[in-house]
Amino acid sequence: MIEWICATCTFNESRALQYLQERQGIRDPLALSVVMANIKQESNFTPNICEGGARVEYQDCHVGGYGLIQWTSESRYVGLGIFSAKYGLNPSTFDAQLRYMSNEYQFQRALLDWQIPGRTYEEYHAAAYRWLGWGIEGPRKTYTYNYLDRLSKVSDEKVQSTSSDQKRLGYLEKILGVIGIKV
């Protein structure tokens, strides 16, 4: 079930957000934002990216990490190839990597924390570190709160925005409507 959407997210970001909710059962918007922020930090949701920025196929990345979460260790990198071959997938694609990522032991262990609603940023972030074990923290926290601000709760009747920018836009549209300008 999808409870959260992101109208301003890219296609791949939206697909990941949907997958994390429907297939992984993550419901808390902060937990979703932490996972999304970490994928953004690692690859900007670009599946065929080799560490350093080169866009290459899976078999052509020979240095550093590869893919959505920059699989770096030999066992995790090779695991992507084995998993993809087993299921007839191309390891350079978004779908193959999302499926592999969510089946990895490290992700499954962190998932147990992300599935518990109402935890703090620090708790969800600690689970993300156990999942990825990054060397560079980067702007993960900034990305997290950016996603959190952009998520909108889906209700039966309407979408309730959590974004202050979208609220401002709605207010501006009302003002323009009053003076006869249709947006």
What positions do the PLM features span?
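A charged, amphipathic interaction segment
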Residues: T93-S163
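Short runs of predominantly hydrophobic/aromatic residues within well-ordered alpha helices
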Residues: A31-V35, L68, Q97-L98, Y124
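Feature targets compositionally biased, intrinsically disordered low-complexity regions
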Residues: Q24, E51-G52, V78, Y87, ...
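Polar low-complexity intrinsically disordered regions enriched in Ser/Thr and small residues
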Residues: R55-V56, G67-Q70, I82-S84, I136-K141, ...
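Extracellular cell-wall/glycan-interacting regions and their flexible linkers
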Residues: M1-M36, A54-R55, Y145-V183
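Generic structural signal of hydrophobic/aromatic residues within well-ordered alpha-helices
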Residues: A16, R76-S84, A110-L112, A127-A128, ...
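Peptidoglycan-targeting cell-wall enzymes and recognition modules
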Residues: I2-Y19, K40-R119
